[in-house]
Amino acid sequence: MAESGDSQQEIARPILALTMGDPCGVGPEIVAVSATRAETLASCRPIVVGSPEILREAAALWRVATQVVAFDSMDEAVRQASSDDPTVRPSSERILCVRTGPPFAEDSIRTGVLPAGKIDARGGDAAFCSVCTAAQAAIDGLVAGLVTAPLHKEAFHLAGHLYPGHTELLAQRCGVADFAMMLYLGHDETVRAPHGLAVVHVTLHTAMRNVVREMTQSAICEKTALVDHFMRRMGCERPRIALCAFNCHNGEGGLFGDEEQTTIRPAVERCVTQGLDATGPLSVDTIFVHARDGLYDAVVAMYHDQGHIALKLIGMHRAVNITLGLPIIRTSVAHGTAFDLAWRGPASGVRISSMLEAIRCATKLARTK
């Protein structure tokens, strides 16, 4: 018997866990607004993970007329999100929220109990608890993936959670050693490659003095293979991958460093023998111009800022942060907690475009498992 249109629609709308991030930052605001947007509800069934009280305060600040329904367990929330009854599922008038982290009273931000736009250990602990709960739900198969709002690394550490960031925490929780951070921009008038542009990083949250040591041939090949796999999931049959040089002017034949000759070029050759369409190393001052114009589908950056700065200049407000190599789907906004803008409401200039793109990307990945 053929499935009804409604049943097919539900299959196409995966359940996603949206973490609230650090409550002292913009996370609760962008989540409260994004979870009730029509484009979100048309593509997925969101469950927010964090403090219901903080979420209600954020919704009120942004004049989002919605009810926040609190749950003490993910199982409960998933059952309601999966219901055939439209009066209990997530909607523009109803946000499902699983309670995690330290308890906060109503109006904790307004009354100053929790400092808006400030580093606070309670904010770091709240972010940690929300992402751990969401990740476990994804590992257990309760949700199709998680979309994370930003945390603050110093607050994270003040709370005793000594991880460099989301990426490393999730890799540890999932028990994987081969993983990578990637930024992604979908196709539009600024990114001409038909399946968008991905930038993966060989090294990540490390001091510049450590990059050369960590930038091994094996690491380069692993990250290149990961971004190739991602772009294939996005519909690109044979991704064209460009690898960045490490030194200025591509090392100028060894005059400005020999990492291009001793490490990067041999890694590119190994990638080619493995069947990848890889080229490089290429000078960084032009590689991203060519990638933006559609010559490449993905770029492999050797270190954090080499990739982040270039991609964010192309499209910061719609970029998505994706963790590659995990057995679960994790996407995120590509910006931080924005303490300077947090809890000032719509007039602050806070944008939700990156969160909406992160939700859209997680939904697409969930459909291509």
Please report, for each region that a protein language model flagged, where it lies by residue.
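Anion-binding alpha/beta catalytic cores of soluble intermediary-metabolism enzymes, centered on
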Residues: 2-259, 265-369
